[in-house]
UniProtKB/Swiss-Prot annotation:
The keyword Cytoplasm applies. Its cofactor is Zn(2+). The keyword Methyltransferase does not apply. It catalyses: tRNA(Ile) + L-isoleucine + ATP = L-isoleucyl-tRNA(Ile) + AMP + diphosphate. GO terms for molecular function: aminoacyl-tRNA deacylase activity; ATP binding; isoleucine-tRNA ligase activity; tRNA binding; zinc ion binding. A motif ('HIGH' region) lies at residues 58-68. A motif ('KMSKS' region) lies at residues 609-613. Its EC number is 6.1.1.5. Binds 1 zinc ion per subunit. This is Isoleucine--tRNA ligase. GO terms for biological process: isoleucyl-tRNA aminoacylation. HAMAP family: Ile_tRNA_synth_type1. It comes from Psychromonas ingrahamii (strain DSM 17664 / CCUG 51855 / 37).
Length: 944
């Protein structure tokens, strides 16, 4: 017997089956950076239409977590897809480098500034700490395969960026959006500083809920506001009853708020006459243990407006006022109002010119001049407040209530509202809020619900307190008059001079600046502001300090490109998306972005938030070290980012399985392109075998669908389409069918080269389509593809060598779709025969297809090549009417199938069973087509 193995076109490639990504990827990274891949991308795309995805800066503290990885991978996928769409899409990563968390870390090492270390030295230590954190995070981000300006990122602590933040503040002031006021802000007594909205978390807290009687200054005057419902108006002091869960704020009470249209009742309760909202009377009196009451009179809230009541323990008279926020859902319908400790209280207090009282120091302790409560921390003062109220017979009820309460996101401790002198961006000054709401309409929000979410937040947010009392932050570089508290009239011009100094020496330049340097003889009249900016102002103004300044964003016209997209987690509607919007509106009166894409949070396999305490944290470093970055990237792409993103070892292993299918498909393509040179061996479209033309056309459909999915940021659709194509169109159909032709046809024949041409087209398209997601693997494939090409796939564009089926094709796309169904039914019949031991494999079988006229016409079009599609040694088509009773029914209407074992001898080269085996004396073991493929011109294939 002869050995014909050497006559076969066996697959051969250096592309390994085992990916070994964890070991291979770091070497590929070295190659990318030693060959300046990112620089080559920029050079290749210079002058093209720009796409700017502006990076929201992560905080420079700690290792990156899985959420960071999701965010950076999503950005990288989108940018790489835009690059392949021939956009110039630079990516400048950034870091948020100022603020309290860094201060706290440095304090642990060197102590608080002003004690063991000077403020200047403390800032230097903070800068050094942040730089080390940036280096650590940058290393991990690069390991993810994310390409960008890693050697020149933007840092909010860069001297130039700090200077530009000051310039941004100057523009806000110039456009009249800044004001100073004593206003209640979220205040953390642990931080000793105001908190931004985004720095507040809500957790359950147990608080005293108390009902307090405020006696009327003039009983008769108050009674005259009511309409009697009985002949008797009762007896005893008249009191309005308030309900509060913050007893410690009662020293700052300056009013009782009522609802204008709500009905209030005057009720006799023992020796008192109490004013309570009618709908709440029964619940309140039950709470007081006095259910034997009678209603004496009623009135509306508006009837009691400006009536005076006595503060329960201070020598004060407080008015009844009207407020829209008063409801009768709980409490008494009479709301304790302390303008110094609540935003609603403050707002209504402005209308009634109420005092904004605050007796609480920065550390949460009542000041020494506070009557009754001096030296007590506010939360410890609650019990003392109850004692004072009880002594004055003003406490009607006290219970413990578990309720949602604001906490500091860093310390996880309860915070307070506290009026302090602060700097604010005024939401309703110069129509900032209204203009922002209008501009939101012009932005594309992905998912669409993001629009409504940010609209509600902008509608309801208070003025933005942008000042902080910290050491490590961009200073508010202002001088205010010592007597009038007014800004210096030349503030904007002076801020530019200060910014120039900061560009050279950093923010320390402000602290070192002697006022006389700028103010001259006026220095004695002005006070230098010592506050720093909220870090959300730092990051929120990067549209002005980075996008509007970096040369990478400069167009050939000399103009600066605006950001096309901001992409962050869903918490940033209240954070960076909003701070960026408000500062951009205040500076430029337009949104800083055209599109905003939001992704969900990462949860574990049980849908639980990841936390160290639960032991369910998934480290991206561990995933990369075990499975490789491409598996992590594939998981991100496969997950619908618009909701919570679930990850677990099991889920990542499923991603690894999907990856293996893609890799094996790619390996098959490369192995069967062995010996193929596209410059000499590429077969013209019209000369290709019909099946090959069809798969190229299917690849074009895939490419169009995938590009459309990339453009709509439907990355999980990209994943689904790619994996389906590799598994179904290729793996289960096309690649299965062509193995015979690929391996056995004459090497330089049209039948073989047509097949290789199709594989080449598929590989050229697939490698590009997968590149944004499977960046390392795509680069590995790219390096092994035949033909001249760019050094890296990322400098190219989508493949343009694909084509559609022509209108005069003998087998249309619909015909091939029908054939896939027929083949699936034949496979079922073959499997039954195998299980019954009637045949060993498909090539031992001869099939008879009993078909309706319509299906028969399709099948006979393939002539003798139908057997190659079905991967059997023989295939006959007969009329449906001739079908024997034992023919197998199928799910294809008008088709029955019979399978018999072939009696013909087996060809030792192609393994087909053919009658002509043994007829050639030189090659008695071979069938006729194998003889032709070895010694003749090679077999001719038209269809398959």
């Amino acid at each position: 017997m002869s050995d014909y193995k050497s006559t076969l076109n066996l697959p051969k490639t250096g592309f390994p089956m085992r990916a070994n990504l964890a070991n291979r990827e770091p070497n590929m990274l070295k190659n990318w950076y030693s060959n300046d891949l990112y620089g080559k991308i920029r050079a290749a795309k210079k002058g093209k239409k720009t796409f700017i995805l502006h990076d929201g800066p992560p905080y420079a503290n700690g290792d990156i977590h899985i959420g960071h990885s999701v965010n950076k991978i999503l950005k990288d996928i989108i940018i790489k897809s835009k690059t392949l769409s021939d956009f110039d899409a630079p990516y400048i990563p950034g870091w948020d480098c100022h603020g309290l968390p860094i201060e706290l870390k440095v304090e642990q090492k060197v102590g608080k500034p002003g004690k063991k270390i000077s403020a200047a030295e403390f800032r230097k230590k903070c800068r050094e700490y942040a730089a080390r954190q940036v280096d650590g995070q940058r290393k991990d981000f690069k390991r993810l395969g994310v390409l960008g300006e890693w050697d020149k990122p933007y840092l909010t602590m860069d001297f130039g960026t700090e200077a530009n933040i000051v310039r941004a503040l100057a523009q806000v002031i110039k456009n009249d959006h800044l004001h100073k006021g004593s206003k209640p802000v979220h205040w953390c007594t642990e931080c000793g500083s105001a908190l931004a909205e985004a720095e507040v978390e809500y957790e359950d807290k147990l608080s005293p809920a108390i009902d307090v009687a405020f006696s009327a200054v003039d009983n008769e005057q108050v009674l005259n506001c009511f309409s009697a419902v009985t002949d008797n108006l009762g007896e005893g002091n008249v009191s309005a009853v308030i309900w509060t869960t913050t007893p410690w704020t009662l020293p700052a009470n300056r009013a009782i708020a009522l609802a204008q249209k709500v009905e209030y009742s005057l009720v006799q309760a023992g020796e008192r006459r109490l004013i309570i909202a009618t709908d709440l009377v029964a619940d309140c009196l039950k709470r007081y243990g006095n259910e034997d009451f009678s209603t004496l009179a009623i009135c509306k809230g508006i009837d009691l407006e400006k009536q005076l009541f006595n503060h329960p323990f201070l020598d004060l008279q407080v008015p009844a006022i009207l407020a829209d926020y008063v409801t009768v859902d709980a409490g008494t319908g009479c709301v304790h109002t302390a303008p110094g400790h609540g935003q609603d209280d403050y707002a209504v207090g402005l209308r009634y010119d109420l005092e904004v009282a605050n007796y609480v120091a920065d550390n949460g302790v009542f000041r020494d001049d506070t009557e009754f409560f001096a030296g007590l921390h506010v939360f410890k003062a609650n019990d003392r407040v109850l004692e004072v109220l009880a002594e004055r017979n003003a406490l009607l009820c006290s219970i413990k209530l578990n309720h949602s309460y604001p906490h500091c996101w860093r310390h996880k401790t309860p915070i307070i509202f506290r009026a302090t002198p602060q700097w604010f961006i005024a939401m309703d000054q110069k129509s900032l809020r209204a203009d922002a709401l209008a501009e939101i309409q012009a932005v594309k929000w992905i998912p669409s619900w993001g629009q409504q979410r940010i609209e509600k937040m902008v509608e309801n947010r208070p003025d933005w307190c942008i000042s902080r009392q910290r050491t490590w932050g961009v200073p508010i570089t202002l001088f205010v008059h010592k007597e009038t508290d007014e800004l210096h009239p030349n503030s904007v011009e002076m801020m530019e001079l200060i910014a120039r100094k900061i560009e050279i020496d950093g923010i320390q330049a402000w602290w070192d600046l002697e006022p006389e340097t700028l103010l001259g003889f006026e220095a004695e009249e002005y006070r230098k502001v010592t506050d720093t900016l909220d870090v959300w102002f730092d990051s929120g103004t990067t549209h002005a300090s980075v996008v509007a300044k970096r040369e990478e964003y400069t167009l050939e016209s000399g103009e600066q490109a605006a950001a096309d997209m901001y992409l962050e987690g869903s918490d940033q509607h209240r954070g960076w998306f909003q701070s960026s919007l408000m500062t951009s509106m205040a500076i430029n009166n337009k949104a800083p972005y055209k599109e905003v894409l939001t992704h969900g949070f990462v949860v574990d396999g049980n849908g639980k938030k990841m936390s160290k305490s639960l032991g369910n944290v998934m480290s991206p470093q561990t995933v990369m070290n075990n499975l490789g970055a491409d598996i992590l990237r594939l998981w991100v792409a496969s997950t619908d980012y618009t909701g919570e993103m679930t990850v677990s070892d099991e889920i990542l292993n499923r991603s690894a399985d999907s990856y293996r299918r893609i890799r094996n498909t790619s390996r098959f393509l490369l192995a069967n392109l062995n010996g193929f040179d596209p410059t000499t061996d590429l077969v013209p479209n019209e000369e290709m075998v019909a099946l090959d033309r069809w798969i190229v056309a299917q690849t074009l459909i895939l490419q169009n669908d995938v590009i459309e999915a990339y453009e709509s940021y439907s990355l999980h659709a990209v994943y689904q389409k790619l994996t389906h194509f590799c598994s179904i169109e290729l793996g289960s159909f096309y690649l299965d069918i062509i193995k015979d032709r690929q391996y056995t046809a004459k090497a330089d024949s049209n039948a073989h080269r047509s097949c290789q041409t199709a594989l080449f087209h598929i590989a050229e398209a697939l490698v590009r389509l997968m590149a944004p997601i499977l960046s390392f693997t795509a680069d590995e494939i790219w390096a092994r593809l035949p033909g001249a090409r760019d050094e890296f796939v990322f400098t190219t564009v989508w493949y343009d060598g694909l084509f559609s089926l022509s209108d005069n094709e003998a087998l249309s796309s619909a015909a091939w779709s029908k054939l896939t169904l027929v083949r699936a039914e034949v496979n079922k019949a073959l499997e039954i025969a195998r299980k019954e031991n009637a045949i060993g494999g498909g090539l031992e079988a001869e099939v008879i297809l009993y078909a309706s006229d319509e299906i028969a016409t399709l099948l006979t079009t393939l002539e003798d090549e139908l057997r190659f599609v079905l991967i059997t040694s023989q295939a006959q088509v007969k009329p449906l009417a001739d079908a024997p009773q034992l023919a197998l029914k199928t799910e294809v209407t008008g088709l029955l199938v019979s399978v018999v074992k072939s009696a013909a001898p087996k060809c030792e080269r192609c393994w087909h069973h053919r009658e002509e085996v043994g007829q050639n004396k030189q090659h008695p073991e071979l069938c006729g087509r194998c003889v032709t493929n070895i010694e003749g011109q090679g077999e001719i294939r038209k269809f398959a």
